[in-house]
């Protein structure tokens, strides 16, 4: 099957001809997400190409950082590492493959289908933090390791994935060691959004956007101390209680 292009107002999708209808739905999702993101971020990411890959091998070959990120991610969240947001391109599995990767638990399919919006959200967050990827240079990846919980968590919250994360969080708590606070890069894809979910409950959406946008010149710990107006120890206790409720 050949590749074709499907345009929308601010995106162009490249995809297998079999995926034309799905590409149109992805573009609709992205245009709606972009409207919301532009209301919250001052960054301009310009026109973006969306590449819908028809196999995992194709995605990994096009974006070598993706298989590495998958290996660095906790097992409970690896199925959700399905793309990468570059400077001018978003690479993601096509919807039929996203659906195939979903588990039988509630919320898995919904999280995967929101992956394009999550990747676009990640691009907007990254644009507000110019020292983070993209591009995926060694120095930027090293900085991302410290800030992964913010980048991935903000993308999850902004795209709506946090509404569907409960079963995956429960699996992570059952199968893995006690998570770090803030979540390490291994847990960022899955647990980063729970920090934003807790912040939204306590301080409102505006506080979440402020945390996502930055800047945070004094580092991740100080960023959390500013976002949650109390000691870091009390915030960690509240977060672990929040995780416990999600894992029930």
Task: Give a label for each model feature.
Residues 57-63, 164-165, 218-223:
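Secretory-pathway/luminal and periplasmic proteins that interact with or process carbohydrate-rich
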Residues 34-41, 116-120, 124-132, 158-163, ...:
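Sec/Tat-exported extracytoplasmic proteins
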Residues 37-53, 127, 131-137, 168-170, ...:
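Surface-exposed patches in mature extracellular/periplasmic domains of secreted proteins
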Residues 75-165:
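Zinc-dependent metallopeptidase catalytic helix centered on the HExxH motif
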Residues 178-248:
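Pan-zinc metallopeptidase signature
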Residues 18-72, 106, 113, 124:
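Zn2+-dependent metallopeptidase catalytic core
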Residues 17-32, 106-111, 115, 145, ...:
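Soluble non-cytosolic domains of exported or imported proteins
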Residues 4-22, 96-101:
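Acidic/histidine-rich, surface-exposed loop or edge segments in extracytoplasmic proteins
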């Amino acid at each position: 099957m050949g590749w074709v292009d499907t345009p929308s107002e601010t995106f162009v999708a490249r995809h297998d001809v079999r995926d034309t209808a799905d590409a149109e739905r992805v573009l609709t999702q992205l245009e709606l997400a972009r409207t919301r993101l532009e209301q919250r971020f001052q960054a301009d990411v310009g026109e973006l190409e969306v590449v819908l890959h028809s196999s995992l091998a194709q995605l990994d070959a096009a974006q070598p950082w993706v298989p590495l990120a998958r290996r660095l991610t906790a097992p409970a969240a690896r199925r959700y590492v399905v793309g990468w947001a570059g400077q001018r391109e978003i690479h993601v599995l096509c919807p039929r493959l996203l659906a195939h990767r979903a588990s039988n638990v509630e919320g898995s399919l919904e999280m995967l289908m929101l992956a394009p919006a999550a990747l676009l959200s990640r691009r907007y967050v990254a644009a507000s933090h110019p020292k983070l990827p993209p591009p995926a240079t060694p120095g930027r990846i090293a900085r991302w390791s410290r800030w992964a919980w913010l980048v991935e968590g903000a993308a999850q919250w902004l795209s709506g994935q946090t509404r569907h994360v409960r079963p995956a969080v429960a699996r992570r708590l059952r199968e893995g060691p006690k998570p770090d606070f803030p979540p390490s890069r291994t847990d960022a894809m899955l647990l980063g959004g729970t920090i934003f979910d807790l912040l939204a409950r306590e301080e409102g959406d505006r506080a979440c956007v402020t945390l996502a946008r930055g800047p945070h010149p004094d580092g991740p710990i100080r960023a959390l101390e500013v976002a949650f107006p109390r000691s870091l120890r009390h915030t960690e206790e509240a977060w672990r209680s929040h995780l416990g409720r999600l894992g029930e």
